[in-house]
Amino acid sequence: MIKVLFLFPKSVDLKTVDDLLANQLVPMVKQVQGFRAIQVNDGDIRSPGGPPPYTKVVEISFDSFDEMMEILQSQKSRSANEFLKSLGTLILLYDVREP
């Protein structure tokens, strides 16, 4: 399974992020074959090393790398990605497995 993790910095207005999720990101990824789940943090983000520099965490799961790439290569996704980068969002892509 492939996961995409979005870490939104504290400098970002939460209403902007919530609007992006509700109106663009969630509807877009739910249309992709191989989409499994989308999860968003609920409440404050904590870290044992002190307050983290992020205010919102979003994790999206796909069955495979190819299915994830289908969404990442679309024009809508490219536009959204540029917007996310302009916000200073950290985006991580990674495989997961059972230990």
Language-model regions, residue ranges each:
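Macromolecular interaction modules
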Residues: M1-P99
